[in-house]
Amino acid sequence: MATLVLGAIGTLVGGPLGGAIGATLGRGLDREIIGNGRREGPRLTELAVSTSSYGQPIPGLYGRVRVPGSVIWASDLAERRETSGGGKGRPKTASYSYSVSLAVALSSRPIERVDRIWADGHLLRGAAGDLKTGGSLRVHRGHADQPPDPLLVAELAARCPAFRGCAYVVFEDLALEDFGNRVPALSFEVIAGSATGVAGEIARTHGFDAVSAPVAELEGYIHDGGSAATTLTHLARLTPLGVQWTPD
């Protein structure tokens, strides 16, 4: 606007040369008042994260298995804004990036470790234990004396459970740029001892005495909380099981 006004005044006072000088002064004034303009990059409008359904069972893991896990806590998405460009009449560009913190339950019994992790089918954490994107990871192995996670303590205070007896992981500030700024589908390679003795352990847990050879063919097993009879029937397809009922 100042460009037009000062250009017109300059033309009236000093002719064409005055108009050029006035227009130049006007452009400088416009930049001071209006600025160089700004471009906004894509930005999310919904920052809440959905967690797993209440009451969803957490399986017991044996041996080496790959599981999706269940999200038991999540923060809202954290938004970061960065501005680049500008100067010499060029507009500034604002870009947005997002991260999330979340806890994912893996097993209802203790585990030894978590090896590889995939996000949307791509390797997120390799055998060396390094995340392929920004953020950090903590593994809680599910022992009876495990302390609460420090991030959950900071967020939930006195309401924070330790999830003793439940193995879970906590991602802190997991960067989401590589996943379309959304929480990706996760899967975890979990090592939980040996699966060869799973039949005996499940039988004893449900009040049975099981006498059988180890299930040598079994590298891993996911016990989803079904009945002992159903579970042992599945395992009996791999090796003969001798099972006796032990009354209470």
What do these predicted ranges mean?
Residues 1-19, 205-206:
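Short hydrophobic membrane-inserting alpha-helices and related fusion/pore-forming segments
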